[in-house]
């Protein structure tokens, strides 16, 4: 029977016929190695500072309680589950274009590095089984760009705490990621700038009770299942120089959407988005940011293909609902608008209800078209509204 490589065995790596390069504090393995076990405790005891494995099959990865090795797995197959709960990772931790065949679990672990170049990356990876990052703490840049999650992914109660002062610097990226099963992001704190642009959620996704304290982008994202942002806070208190801080522009929602009691404390963009099913903004609040009281929330050119609820909303900042197409019933009852609202050139194809709402500032329905019932019962306008060239057919 073929024996393990004696040299690598000294470093806690059990493999056969591996092409390797071993320097003073570096180990590299490449080109179709079959690795039975990697033991990080032994590697660290041997003084290894950097481990790079490329195009290999790996069965067992055994991390140490504290891991300070710079790690890069490049185009590898990870064939056994990874159990890495309650561990500390102090250095670069990269899996690039890897395929994980079984569960990975980094719950309750802590990722912390001291410089921008040393980050956590699972870029372009494929996860064939469940992924767990429950209560994981990230104090570094995190990259899941263009990765595919074929089963459930759970980040509940995780914290993304890294903050850079540079404008447009993405600190947490799920750009172009694909979620084929349910995704859970409950009770998360994002102090980092995060980007889900061009991501595809093919099943349910939940961001309930999550805090976005920095810039957040969902531009050109596709939500194919139920999407829940209930009780989520979009604070965007970090990176105040960033022009667009909360972005859902050109986004497609195919199933029911919940923004119930969500709070937007900075300008939010929904322009050119499409809601193909019911959407619920009941009890939401749109506030003026602390550093720009002239901001305007933008729902320009949005298409609502089913019923939409905006009841009991407080608009503390101006909102554009211009050039929208409302195909289902629209409910904007009991809203309080303290700033200007613009609905000009919008098309209401079904019933719309503004019952008992209070518009404390200017509101424009200029050139709107109401095909059915438009109910303004009990509405109070503190300033003269603009209905010029509006058409009422109901």
Regions found by a protein language model. Name each.
Residues 1-394:
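N-terminal leader/targeting and pre-domain segments
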